Amino acid sequence: FVNQHLCGSHLVEALYLVCGNDGFFYRPKAGIVDQCCTGVCSLYQLQNYCN
């Protein structure tokens, strides 16, 4: 997994892939869009959103 820009459905698909059956949660104040869409996201950053 390479750091990359993830926006919209690509971001959701990446979260499903990383989190698996645990699912994930959305924290508006955490800025996942700023982190992953405007900037680039690492696998570690995505895992922070898993349940």
From Swiss-Prot:
Database matches in SMART domains: IlGF (SM00078)
Subcellular location field: Secreted
InterPro entries on file: Insulin, Insulin-like, Insulin-like_sf, Insulin_CS, Insulin_family
Gene Ontology annotations for the cellular component aspect, listed alphabetically: extracellular space
Role this protein plays: Insulin decreases blood glucose concentration. It increases cell permeability to monosaccharides, amino acids and fatty acids. It accelerates glycolysis, the pentose phosphate cycle, and glycogen synthesis in liver.
Subunit structure: Heterodimer of a B chain and an A chain linked by two disulfide bonds.
Entry similarity comment: Belongs to the insulin family.
Name this polypeptide is given: Insulin
Source organism of this protein record: Hystrix cristata
